[in-house]
């Protein structure tokens, strides 16, 4: 009897060792560079190591974790177990109703107020406005448990205190009243419905007449799965349609760092990449200029990626738009204002998270010593 148990035990041990060996071989033989589900580059096999710093173990562990066979299925199973057992907040992003939302922004009202006051100081005598969208989680609080709702209520309180100040264009009521979603279900950015509402709110505050839909050519790209879905680790059970509005009037689009000039603002070839949102304005650029010879006025936009889908709309109302993303711009806010010449207006367009937590924004607002 003992001999039979011993044989069975050995078979089990050998079987486990064989599986581990095969898994290790597969990890090296069939390694991948990129995960389409997680939308990130995977670790590469370690080539060099030093006995002085002993990094091989960590590098090898990271590599095997990324390259293990069936990794995406295992990650998806683990994420679903987190949701089914009431631990969804352990995920990097949180399932809520039919959407995936970002966790609430950690923001301090005084810090935000000081930061926007410095932005006004940079603008000087030039009229400036602020456009800060509410978060998707803030709009979906009623779909959450009481515990999760409480942390978004704190976020909403900070947002209300910030956007109630002078120069802020209100968006919350219009977004909350919309019968259609204003954010993508799988991404943290606003969708075209949200962009249009923001455009109309800006025009109402700044004065220009909003351009009609006939001024643009609408193109849809489907399916679109955003980075918020990818970071949840959940299978792509939901998908969005990416909607782009290309001006039907003549425009030029110049990227400063490359010197390249285009006659369009959307880039269809980007729609099928790992970050389909780069279809707007060809992704992230430090400084770009959009010109419309049929319009007048100069607008300077300090922005994050939320502005990428709004600028095509704004191009109908301004002869020249200079857009600066300080994350990719070498200079400060003051440097960008000087480089832009003499704009008639300034728009600061940032998500609440960028405004509160982006270190580039904080650092490049500082006064020079």
Regions found by a protein language model. Give the residues of each.
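Extracellular glycan-modifying ectodomains
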Residues: 1-369
């Amino acid at each position: 009897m003992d001999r039979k148990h011993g044989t069975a035990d050995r078979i089990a041990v050998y079987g486990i060792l064989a599986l581990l060996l095969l898994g290790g071989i597969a990890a090296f033989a069939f390694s991948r560079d990129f995960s389409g589900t997680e939308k990130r580059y995977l670790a590469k096999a370690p080539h060099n190591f030093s006995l002085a710093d002993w990094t091989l173990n960590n590098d090898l562990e990271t590599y095997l974790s990324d390259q293990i066979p069936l990794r995406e299925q295992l990650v998806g199973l683990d994420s679903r177990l987190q949701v089914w057992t009431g631990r969804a907040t352990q995920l990097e992003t949180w399932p809520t109703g039919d959407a995936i939302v970002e966790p609430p922004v950690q923001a301090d009202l005084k810090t935000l107020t000081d930061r926007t006051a410095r932005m006004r100081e940079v603008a000087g005598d030039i009229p400036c406005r602020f456009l800060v969208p509410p978060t998707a989680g803030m709009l979906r609080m009623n779909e959450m448990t009481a515990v999760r709702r409480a942390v978004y209520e704190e976020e909403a309180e900070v947002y209300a205190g910030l956007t109630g100040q002078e120069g802020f264009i209100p968006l919350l009521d219009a977004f909350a009243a919309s019968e259609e979603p204003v954010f993508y279900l799988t991404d943290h950015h606003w969708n075209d419905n949200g962009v249009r509402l923001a455009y109309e709110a800006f025009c109402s505050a700044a004065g220009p007449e909003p351009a009609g839909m006939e001024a643009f050519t609408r193109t849809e790209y489907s399916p679109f799965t955003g980075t918020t879905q990818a970071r949840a680790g959940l299978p792509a059970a939901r998908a969005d349609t990416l909607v782009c509005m290309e001006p039907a009037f003549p425009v030029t689009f110049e990227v400063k760092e490359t010197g390249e000039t285009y006659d369009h603002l959307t880039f269809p070839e980007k729609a099928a990449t790992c970050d389909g949102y780069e279809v707007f304005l060809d992704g992230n650029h430090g400084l770009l200029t959009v010109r419309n010879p049929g319009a007048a006025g100069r607008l300077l936009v300090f922005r994050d990626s939320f502005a990428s889908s709004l600028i095509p709309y704004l191009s109908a109302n301004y002869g020249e738009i200079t857009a600066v993303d300080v994350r990719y711009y070498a200079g400060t806010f003051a440097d960008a204002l000087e480089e832009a010449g003499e704009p008639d207006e300034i728009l600061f367009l940032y998500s609440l998270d960028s405004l509160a937590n982006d270190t580039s924004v904080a650092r490049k607002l500082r006064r020079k010593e």
